[in-house]
């Protein structure tokens, strides 16, 4: 049996509305490099460490209506990220499909489980002691991951198991999601062409 030749998995998504102008460029088989500017400092930090811990290359630009609030910017970037993940994965041949990770961050401990099934679902269990961290409304953390799951067409179960510092809890969550995804997207020649008895993960 011949060994499959793996081509680079990249995607660029651009999205323009009356509220935001977003560009997301993604390389799944990267080295964790990033260049992120959304105008929301803490969100930039989370996306940057998502790239680093996910071993993917990520460029994000967003010019949003931050004079209103951070909602439109954060939502539209998450939509772009989800679409880029879906586009880059292509037919999902030879991927592991599933991934999970636990990540501690001082007082916080988070768990992420992902299935690149082609079906959208997100369940997040977390509470935060502050309404905002570094310009990011904490109520949007769940919205970020729901938007990613919807547009990447994947199944995400995310849990903050313990902690009391909102910054640490959110950071542990993003790192856990990144590391779970890193496992799920990994390609190996000895993996089934498509990891499903249906023959497709579309």
Curated annotation (Swiss-Prot):
Coiled-coil residues: none
Organism: Salinibacter ruber (strain DSM 13855 / M31)
Molecular function per GO: imidazoleglycerol-phosphate dehydratase activity
Catalytic reactions on record: D-erythro-1-(imidazol-4-yl)glycerol 3-phosphate = 3-(imidazol-4-yl)-2-oxopropyl phosphate + H2O
Protein name: Imidazoleglycerol-phosphate dehydratase
Main location: cytoplasm
Keyword tags: Amino-acid biosynthesis, Cytoplasm, Histidine biosynthesis, Lyase
GO CC terms, sorted: cytoplasm
PROSITE patterns xref list: IGP_DEHYDRATASE_2
Pfam families: IGPD
Example GO biological process: L-histidine biosynthetic process
Pathway: Amino-acid biosynthesis; L-histidine biosynthesis; L-histidine from 5-phospho-alpha-D-ribose 1-diphosphate: step 6/9
Top enzyme category: lyase
Family statement: Belongs to the imidazoleglycerol-phosphate dehydratase family.
Lyase among keywords: yes
EC number: 4.2.1.19
InterPro entries on file: IGPD_sf (IPR038494), ImidazoleglycerolP_deHydtase (IPR000807), ImidazoleglycerP_deHydtase_CS (IPR020565), Ribosomal_Su5_D2-typ_SF (IPR020568)
Compartment(s) of residence: Cytoplasm
């Amino acid at each position: 049996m011949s060994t499959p030749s793996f081509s680079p998995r990249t995607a660029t998504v651009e999205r323009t509305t009356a509220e935001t102008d977003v560009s997301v460029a993604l390389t799944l088989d990267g080295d964790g490099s990033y260049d992120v500017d959304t105008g929301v400092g803490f969100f930039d930090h989370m996306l940057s460490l998502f790239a680093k811990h996910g071993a993917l290359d990520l460029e994000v630009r967003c010019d949003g209506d931050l004079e209103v609030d951070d909602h439109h910017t954060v939502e539209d970037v998450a939509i772009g990220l989800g679409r880029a993940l879906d586009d880059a994965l292509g037919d999902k041949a030879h991927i592991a499909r599933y991934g999970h990770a636990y990540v501690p961050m001082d007082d916080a401990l988070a768990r992420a489980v992902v299935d690149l099934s082609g079906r959208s679902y997100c369940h997040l269990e977390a509470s935060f002691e502050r309404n905002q961290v570094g310009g990011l409304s904490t109520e949007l953390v769940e919205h970020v991951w729901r938007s990613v799951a919807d547009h990447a067409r994947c199944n995400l179960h995310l849990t903050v198991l313990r902690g009391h510092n909102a910054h640490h809890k959110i950071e542990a969550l993003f790192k856990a999601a990144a590391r779970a995804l890193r496992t799920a997207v990994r390609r190996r020649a000895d993996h089934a062409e498509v990891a499903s008895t249906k023959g497709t993960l579309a």
